[in-house]
Amino acid sequence: HLVNAGGIHYEPFGLYPGTETSLDNIDNATIAVPNDTTNEARALLLLQDNGYITLKDGVGLTATTKDIVENPHNITFVELEAAQVPRTLPEVSFGVLNGNYAMEAGLTVADDALLYESDDSEAAATYVNVIAVKEGNENLPKIKALVDTLKSDEIKQFINDNYNGGVIPYK
């Protein structure tokens, strides 16, 4: 049985510009989101966390567009296979992308994302990359030393310098 010895980093979802380059233009916008359950929920939570929509209480990481209870900006959602979202950016106002698809499209969180998941978001806490060890070994000195090293300021700086926000050190 494996357990979490420590969270190290996560890859944030981001909202990227399409035909619009500013969130000042979000009224009546069309936003492309991934259509698979996990990624669609992350996209919707990103928008909720930033005050653009409200989801039903408790849906969390199972949210779909059917769970939107308030949409004050009259946003239209286009649900697509995640790999298709970057290709549709010229045709939609904005798109919410997984980090890997953003990088493949030449986009970076640091330079291009208008919004991205914070390290205290539900998604970051759920999808953080961890050091997994056999249960009972999580408190061994060598495991603690490994986790401490991977969470050190030096490693955090390396991540920040090399991944343009596509990978973010976890708190």
Annotate each predicted stretch with a short phrase.
Residues 1-5, 20, 91, 96, ...:
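Ligand-binding "clamshell"
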Residues 1-53:
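A conserved helix-loop-strand patch within extracytoplasmic ligand-binding domains
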Residues 12-23, 127-140:
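A bilobed periplasmic-binding-protein/Venus flytrap-type ligand-binding module shared by bacterial periplasmic
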Residues 21-22, 37-39, 83-85, 100-104, ...:
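Solvent-exposed loop/turn segments at secondary-structure junctions
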Residues 27-29, 138-149:
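Short amphipathic alpha-helical coupling segments at ligand-binding clamshell hinges
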Residues 27-29, 52-79:
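A local structural motif
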Residues 41-48, 150-170:
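Periplasmic-binding protein-like
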Residues 45-46, 66-101:
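Short helices/loops that flank or line small-molecule/ion binding pockets
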